[in-house]
């Protein structure tokens, strides 16, 4: 079985945050702490190294963890961050989570590691109803395929998953761990619920 220490994890914070009014989502505060701090706290308990993918406010993010930026222009979405994370990783297996999901499961890394098969390229979380495409674990061997995918202008992460050996990791018992906060209204509502 793959061990958590044999993986590294990248928090995706490189988007444009258009639904958050352009504010950098990872740095937006929830109950006095930046959203990214919640994600870091959850991952830090799981015995993995953490990197952040960001394309602005780099100094702010570097206060939390090492930062890698997209090398493809024009914000290619989560795949740009996945590409940057894979390209700069020191491990063969690299996991990715979004910066705006404060309730990541305490055993997220362990579940992903347990689901790896010998021929797996990519593992994707599934909440029992929906695929959670940016909660994912990639093997570095996907990098050439990902680069070709991005170079031809493809941006839909689900299409890449169809080109690779993709497994799904069951989180049907913990669907709330995928709550993500995309708008100021969602942030306010979530903060009130806590």
From Swiss-Prot:
Subcellular location: Cytoplasm
Domain of life: Bacteria
Residues the entry annotates as binding GTP: 12-14, 25, 53, 70, 100
Cofactor(s) for this UniProt protein: Mg(2+)
First and last residue of the signal peptide: none
Entry keywords, A to Z: Cytoplasm, GTP-binding, Magnesium, Metal-binding, Molybdenum cofactor biosynthesis, Nucleotide-binding, Transferase
Main localisation: cytoplasm
One annotated GO biological process: bis(molybdopterin guanine dinucleotide)molybdenum biosynthetic process
A Pfam family hit: NTP_transf_3
InterPro entries: MobA-like_NTP_Trfase, Molybde_CF_guanTrfase, Nucleotide-diphossugar_trans
One GO cellular component term: cytoplasm
EC id: 2.7.7.77
GO molecular function: GTP binding; metal ion binding; molybdenum cofactor guanylyltransferase activity
Catalytic activity field: Mo-molybdopterin + GTP + H(+) = Mo-molybdopterin guanine dinucleotide + diphosphate
Entry annotated with the keyword Lipid biosynthesis: no
Family indicated by similarity: Belongs to the MobA family.
Quaternary structure (record): Monomer.
PANTHER family cross-referenced by the UniProt entry: MOLYBDENUM COFACTOR GUANYLYLTRANSFERASE
Domain remarks: The N-terminal domain determines nucleotide recognition and specific binding, while the C-terminal domain determines the specific binding to the target protein.
Stated role: Transfers a GMP moiety from GTP to Mo-molybdopterin (Mo-MPT) cofactor (Moco or molybdenum cofactor) to form Mo-molybdopterin guanine dinucleotide (Mo-MGD) cofactor.
Protein name listed in UniProt: Molybdenum cofactor guanylyltransferase
Organism: Vibrio atlanticus (strain LGP32) (Vibrio splendidus (strain Mel32))
Gene expressing this chain: mobA
